[in-house]
Amino acid sequence: RRQRQMCIRDSKKAKIPFGRLLLQTPSEPRTSIPDFRTLRNLPLETFSPNLEQTLAASESRLDWYTDFAEEEGVDGPSFLGWADTSNNPEAIADRTKEVLGLAAETFLQGPDKVKTLCGVLEDSGILVSRNSIVESTTTRPLSIDEFRGFTLIQASYALIFINTRDSKTAQLFSLSHELGHVVLGQPGISDHGESRDIERWCNRFAASFLAPASLVLSTVSPSDSPFDSVKTLSRKSGMSQEAALWRLVHLNIIDEGEASKLRPLVAPQPVQAMEPSSNKGGPARHRVVKARVGNRFFEAVTYATVAGKIPQREAAQLLGAATADSLSKLIAHSPSAEWRAS
């Protein structure tokens, strides 16, 4: 009995189900999502408990939303799976921007480009979740060394998850990269590496989506120094200086030799994102929850609750509300009565 208690204690500390500790051979993570992450060009084959639980929670949300949307007659994104890696990523990026209603001749607008793009993607029918921790557990941070984002696809619906432990510029690139996965109809866990064909394609797609070639050429002046060109493109596109540098190299505006000199100047600095809280001075609770589960999912659940389509207990579980009062407060901050999913 004492040994069993010790095993249970150890399983809780390791965030591993007790039954898995009893197996002679460690079990594989319970997910079928393709893993495109690499380390030194070799595939990664492990999932931390934090990543595994984040994947499981996201899969559950997409499962629920898929059933709900199909019953309500709500379509998924019209561009899901409309391309493959044989297509030119720049041409597909231009076409995707057009379908999303984004002007080809301008960069993403607004002081918070991540928020802007999240809104555009959710309006198109994609679920977008952002978090830097496992659900609401602040003692379990997500690691950007393990993953930057992932895309889940079920039937004609998709969910994008972004690790907000990353910098804002990296989050923006991740959103665009994961959009590439949606366009390809290819779910997966991403790290923006270059050793996999799909990841390379999605990187090119993201760079083209955020900084279309014609727009870059009209923005960067031939009289600018290479570093000034990098800073200008980074500021206007929302990409990191490193991503802007390689976009300019790809467009033959900066040569490889000059780029190698600039690399130390544009190398990303480690960022430790602070998890928003509903405490005094932080965002309100409903804003935190909306970011974690996504506006579209939040409004679908609250609409279904108010309309009597699902019980409050299920809604509370889907939104992570601990009490009926917490759920009521979340519902009060949703335009659920006027929600339009299409």
Please tell me what each predicted stretch does:
Residues 1-342:
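Active-site hotspot residues in diverse enzymes, especially metal/ion-binding acidic/histidine motifs
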